[in-house]
Design a protein with these regions (language model features):
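Glycine-rich phosphate/adenylate-binding loop and adjacent beta-alpha elements
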Residues: 20-37, 42-44
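Ferredoxin-type iron-sulfur electron-transfer modules in oxidoreductases and energy-metabolism complexes
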Residues: 1, 40-176
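Short active-site-adjacent helix-start/loop capping segments
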Residues: 11, 15-17, 27, 37, ...
Length: 176
């Protein structure tokens, strides 16, 4: 038997991430005709930079540990007296792309820095950090930026190869 993950078949859950001919992809939205139109050989592998559990299944423990390093939740300085804490559309516009992340790990799989430095926070965590540092409702912007700037494995360890941007199935462009 062959072990693999899949769930939605609509590229919204991110569970089916794998390497196809060396690049991370969501296989539920990857058509063989697009990759091998003339019947070329396909190589399907588990995602990179993550521990292989079995066959094409990888452990996401490291992935989520990287995400946790950026405190991935909104931390406002006060709670509104009534209703929701609403931000204007204009103030949230620059976050729309990062909010599309489905946490599939394709960017982490193909990150060239993570191949040589397991301490690097990784592109998914950096995209998640961007989502909260730029949210006008969040009060921890300076603290988040300090962690990203000062800690070993932070943002300055990125080599800007932009492989994460190239493989992101949702166009999040974590390092663009």
């Amino acid at each position: 038997t062959l072990a693999l993950r899949c769930a939605c078949r609509a590229s919204i859950c991110g569970s089916c991430g794998m390497k196809v001919n060396g690049d991370a992809k969501l296989v539920c939205k990857t058509r063989v005709d697009d990759i091998a139109p003339n019947g070329e050989q396909l190589v399907i592998e588990p995602m990179g930079n993550q521990h292989v559990v079995r066959d094409l299944v990888v452990s996401l423990d490291t992935f989520f540990s990287q995400i946790k390093r950026v405190d991935p939740f909104l931390q406002p300085d006060h709670v509104p007296e009534q209703g929701e804490y609403i931000a204007s559309d204009d103030s949230m516009e620059n976050l729309l792309t990062s909010m599309n992340c489905i946490m599939c790990g394709c960017c982490v799989s193909d990150c060239t820095v993570l191949e040589v430095d397991a301490n690097f926070i990784g592109p998914a965590a950096l995209a998640k950090a961007w989502r909260f540092t730029e949210d006008p409702r969040d009060s921890k912007r300076d603290e988040r930026l300090k962690v990203l700037n000062d800690e070993a494995g932070g943002i300055w360890d990125c080599t800007r190869c932009l492989k994460c941007v190239e493989v992101c199935p949702k166009g999040v462009a974590p390092m663009d």
